[in-house]
């Protein structure tokens, strides 16, 4: 008897699609059991066995979610802690190096769905923006593959328990440095700044200065 090939789609925000290149480079496993596709257009997604919602910030309607058998959100925090936007960045700002990845069921209320899996990865405290992003992506791929290995026979849901908090969307102001504070006290802000897209900056005597950060590769 021919095995069923489960249809899997990754819904990725068009304006926040950096994860796609990692998913492409790091082969998704179990291709004999799953067919994979990527989309940033919900109109092209229907009747999927599994929909992974990755870095997608728009609200999805109940009717859309009901059109798929299982809708999963990958969220980089120890839910119910750090619901909302930029969970990794907000944890880095608090000095955390142990970061969880939660795989949850999508529902109407943001980041409140039942938990299927939790895994964690570690930062060094010296990682810069690109390194943090890379480690996050690798951890996301790992939890995806772990779930696909278990599906459909060995999956369990657990309700979220404990205190929760909700992080607001980060803005340009979050990259602003205070020239009256030390670099050490603001190092996490520098770590989270993207030299290309949103570098750190400060004002002095009415002028705005851009500050970019690199590791010395010569040492």
Outline where the language-model segments fall.
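One-carbon transfer enzymes
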Residues: 1-219
